[in-house]
Amino acid sequence: MHVITKKRLIEFAAEYPTARDPLLKWYVVVSKTDFAPFSALRSAFGSVDQVGKFTVFDIGGNKYRLIAAIHFNRRRVYIRHVLTHAEYDKGKWKEK
């Protein structure tokens, strides 16, 4: 899959250093694998859910959330948000 954009992962990891390794691990797995359909994602990442039009990944032992729009037919993963669990729970990301 082609991940757009890795820059968001790097910026988030700069602010939250403990997120760096789990985010990079996520990036490597996703960028080197073709996932289709959603059930393939669930097999690779047990903690992934569909929330509306977005796919939400639990990252770093449930400390962080990565929210992406995935276009399986185009092999594209668009990172929309990377949040702490507390930021995710506030739900403001749904408004954007």
Where are these regions (language model features)?
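Basic, Lys/Arg-enriched alpha-helical interface segments
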Residues: 1-63, 71-78, 86-96
